[in-house]
Amino acid sequence: MRKQKILIVLFVGSLVLPGVVWAGFSGRFDTENNENRKLAEFPEVNLESLGDFPEQFEAYYKDHVPFKNDLVKFCNFIDTEFFRNTKIGDVVIGEDNWLFYLPEREGENAMADYQKTNVYTLEQSAEIASGIAKVRDWFLDRGVKQFHYYVAPNKETLYSKYMPEKPKVIGIGDSRMETFAKYMKENSDVEFDFLADYLREFTEKYQLFRKYDTHMNNLGGYITNEKIVQDMTGESLPIEDIQVMIGTKPCRGDLSRMIGRYKELNDDREYGLNYFHDGIRYKVKKEESEGGEEILKVFKSNSENEKTLMVIGDSFRLR
């Protein structure tokens, strides 16, 4: 009987004690959102939504359970250091701790892209090409002088040498985007560029992506930008003609945050660029949605070039 009471006390204590400790000392622990999504909020309590409350509260509790980040960090450490796992959630850990983002879900399956298991059929390529052409025509009909469609390569495309042995590339031949780029070149009059081959020429001399992030660094952004400028104006300032400096502060990233090693992985550096386009100054006006998400940036400069450039894209456009 006494043994049962002790077990009951230990069980109840294991449920209650973490919450009590957390309530008093949560400020001393890591409580940042380390996931690439918005965490669930505490659900509203009312008669209309009472039936949904248990499920919504469970989602909230899972996202805000006490010591979550520290527990995740510990589990990830065990996975990588003892069991030598190279994939934690959507993040693949490569050579020299290079991190890659390879989710496997509908609409965002970078893993299938890397493994070359999702190559477009001719019918799919034709449908997508037709959609791009319609967008191009819509802009041209409204006075736009030039329309160009660029596709930036994924990090694992340029830096596959740092990928681990698993996951293995399954498909033979071109990837989905390589196949589609060839289709566009042979069957469409849209100005289209998949930038993998262009950027690959620079990877031996320069690091173009942040080691622990999904995005390009300043070097990758500059080289890509000058490619666009060259296409649009016929002029550019090659990166070889400017001063490149290595920063001194750690360049951390979203991927190291996602696996709970944001502070530990600190050997990467951002690059500074000097002596380019001297005398050019610009101002930036930002517009945000009601939720605080940035939806528009307007740049104005003192450049003699009076042309207007509009860039529509994902987070890579900010580099």
Model-derived features with residue positions:
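Extracellular glycan-modifying ectodomains
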Residues: M1-R319
